[in-house]
């Protein structure tokens, strides 16, 4: 797939993103009914997780080095959540659960972490030391292109919720044994920022992308855009909304 140029003013400008031409075509065609639920949608149905006005070949597929579990707050508005974008772009590696449903987390079989800030949270670069502390690292071999690469974790849990609703999930006893990982401070490009929140509060799809990028940089070879297409929809919508703001004189 060819790459689309992004606005230079955007933090998304250097991404290696598949062509947005199918999204441009779908936008011109307008909203359509979701074939599953019948609701009017554009690009995808955020309730059903189905493509709308697009064919599977129009959308890039991303292979991830770890499995991603997203626990969505039941009161999180579907239309404001970016979690479904991860599922559409990496369907083999991403699963979404609506709380109180959570995944089976067997720490005896897998190294699992929860991405959430806190006083005891570690950084991505500290993962290897943490999971190898007993001198017997449990490591799953991950194949990338022609190489077998080592990764200290196999599963990552994210919470999809506004910050003022996270306590209900983060305090669940089923998650208490999971070590926490905190991302480096980065500014969000999300256009639906929570009122009163700092610009370092990332959308779920941004958090997943930055975590995987950091993981790759620390434990694999040089990062060359392997997960950039996770922001395929996000970068297009960001560009679209910025254009609309500029046209309205609000940018």
Curated annotation (Swiss-Prot):
Keywords: Nucleus, S-adenosyl-L-methionine, Transferase, tRNA processing. It catalyses: a uridine in tRNA + S-adenosyl-L-methionine = a 3-[(3S)-3-amino-3-carboxypropyl]uridine in tRNA + S-methyl-5'-thioadenosine + H(+). GO terms for biological process: tRNA modification. It comes from the Eukaryota. A motif (DXTW) lies at residues 160-163. Pfam families: DTW. Its main location: nucleus. Catalyzes the formation of 3-(3-amino-3-carboxypropyl)uridine (acp3U) at position 20 in the D-loop of several cytoplasmic tRNAs (acp3U(20)). Belongs to the TDD superfamily. DTWD1 family. This is tRNA-uridine aminocarboxypropyltransferase 1. It comes from Danio rerio (Zebrafish).
């Amino acid at each position: 797939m060819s790459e689309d140029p992004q606005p230079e003013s955007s933090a998304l400008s250097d991404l290696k993103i598949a062509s947005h031409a199918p999204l441009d075509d779908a936008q011109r065609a307008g909203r359509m009914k979701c074939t599953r639920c019948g609701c009017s949608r554009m690009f995808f149905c955020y309730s059903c997780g189905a493509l709308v006005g697009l064919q599977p070949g129009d959308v890039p597929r991303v292979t991830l080095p770890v499995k991603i579990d997203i626990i969505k707050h039941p009161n999180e508005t579907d239309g404001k959540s970016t979690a479904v974008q991860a599922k559409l772009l990496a369907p083999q590696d991403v699963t979404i659960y609506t709380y109180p449903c959570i995944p089976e987390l067997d720490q005896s079989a897998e190294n699992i972490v929860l991405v959430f800030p806190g006083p005891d949270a570690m950084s991505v670069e500290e993962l290897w030391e943490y999971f190898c502390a007993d001198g017997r690292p449990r490591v799953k071999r991950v194949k990338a292109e022609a190489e077998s690469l080592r990764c200290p974790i196999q599963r990552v849990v994210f919470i999809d919720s506004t910050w003022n609703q996270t306590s209900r999930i983060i305090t669940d006893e089923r998650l208490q044994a999971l070590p926490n990982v905190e991302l480096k401070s980065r500014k969000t490009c999300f256009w639906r920022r929570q009122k009163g929140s700092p610009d370092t509060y990332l959308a779920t799809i941004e958090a997943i992308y930055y975590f995987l990028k950091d993981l790759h940089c620390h434990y694999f070879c040089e990062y060359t855009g392997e997960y950039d297409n996770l922001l395929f929809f996000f970068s297009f919508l960001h560009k679209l909304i910025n254009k609309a703001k500029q046209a309205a004189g609000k940018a």
